[in-house]
Amino acid sequence: MALNISSVFSNLFAGFSSDFKKKNFSLYGQWIGLLTIFLCIALGIANIFHASVVIVFSIICIVQGLVVVFVEIPFLLKICPLTDKFTTFIRNFDENWPRCGFYILMGAIQWLSLTVQVTSLIVVAVFFTLAGICYALAAFMHQEYLKTSFNVAGEPDSLEGQVGDHIVRNVL
């Protein structure tokens, strides 16, 4: 297999470190958003077993995680069969200010879950708020909206990168 686990992690961490060297808050917001996807799904499922209104916030959290997947990984908009209305809605978040508002709104929804009962959904609320703050700082500092530069398949000029690009081309 051309792509093994060690090369994937090596490429992931190389992209992660190169993104943080750029000192652009939109990249920080994107990485926090990617982490929030996993937190939303995991903590949403973990809190769904409460016998109170927290169940509603757990379901909302899972849905938020799935929406953030499409916001932060726009490649999925091309390969997943989605309605044009949803795709257009997600494409509205391609700048710092819209993403700031999106994450602050998502965080506010999860902060509201604390009015019912304090649960681990507070972690999701904190991370949504942090992502919103990062995008707000990027907008205030007039930083260009950047997307992460990591490539799991490797550099395009390497053999692994060419194999990865070929696989993606065949999928599309």
UniProtKB/Swiss-Prot annotation:
User: According to its UniProt record, where is this protein located?
Assistant: Golgi apparatus membrane
- Record gene name: TVP18
Taxonomic lineage of the native organism: Eukaryota, Fungi, Dikarya, Ascomycota, Saccharomycotina
Q: Which organism is it from?
A: Debaryomyces hansenii (strain ATCC 36239 / CBS 767 / BCRC 21394 / JCM 1990 / NBRC 0083 / IGC 2968)
- Per UniProt, which keywords does this protein have? Glycoprotein, Golgi apparatus, Membrane, Transmembrane, Transmembrane helix
- Give all cystine bridges in this chain: none
The membrane-topology field of this record reads:
Multi-pass membrane protein
Q: Got a GO cellular component term for this one?
A: Golgi membrane
Q: What is this protein called?
A: Golgi apparatus membrane protein TVP18
- Which GO biological process categories is it annotated with? vesicle-mediated transport
Entries under Pfam families matching the protein: Cg6151-P
